[in-house]
Amino acid sequence: MLNWFTKFNYLMSNILIIKHGSLGDIVQISGVLQDIRETQQGNKIFILTTIQYVDLLSRCPFVDAVLIDKRLPRWNLAYLYKLKKLIKKYNFVKVYDLQNSSRTSFYRKFLFNIANWSSTSTTLKKGTNKKDFDQNSVLERFKIQLENSDVKTKNVLNPNFSWACINVDKIVNKYFGKKFILIFPFSSPKLTHKQWPYYNELITIIKTKHPNLEIAMAPSPNEIEDAKKINAVSITNFNKSLNIMELAGLIKKSSFVVSNDTGPAHMSAHLGKDGLVLFGYHTTPKKVSIETDKFKALSVDDLKNLTAQNVYEKIKNKLELIN
């Protein structure tokens, strides 16, 4: 005879979520994960992701376990076989494909053999044009995918990333004790067109007008050298870049954020921070679902033509409210 605990486990089903992508992509699915969790109560939720997000997603309250996809080339048959074995082991009854890529489409068709698969291609309603669908913002597309998969969408449009934060008081107190503005003046090395070139000029204006505010940044490992050229405090933890959870805690503790269109900008938006993100021609704030009631975007055709004074005019009222 089965005891209660054994019965409970016997009745549970395993659910798989797939999400690779950039830091901003991971941040944005917080509401999606929460909605899936609330729909799949009583079932065990796994997420398949890349190794750099394992520590982060291991603390996410909406998933139970994290699986690693090394995303090796598809001609690496030994790796594909190993991945197939890993997935088969858990006998997943449902997949939510949040990556919606050619790679995950390949997994669905040739590798995982799981019939109940939610992706944009499998859930798009008859008569809906894919090109029109793709004009929606990132979060709107997720909302449609979830609704067409019988998931109640209460949180998808308003992701809350606060679960990622850890306390960073000991780190920050080594640098200063007053309120601070956080800047993110860099971007991925491959996306330098996203970088606004006048952060030092903006810093000079802010320090002149608001001497009560400190200005800080948190460079990633490949930004530490470039950060020496910026007139702001570089926050590290024992001379190492902050991890994602520490960075989330630092953003949460800040009074205002100014950023290029990067992962930390998405973190700031979905941690409920006041801030401004700067956009050039590469995309629109609506397309990437970054604006909130507090976190706003300033878009221009060419970031090189956006002056420091223009940016300051957009944020000065908010800075004046910081005691």
Predicted regions and their residues:
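Catalytic machinery of carbohydrate-active enzymes
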Residues: 1-323
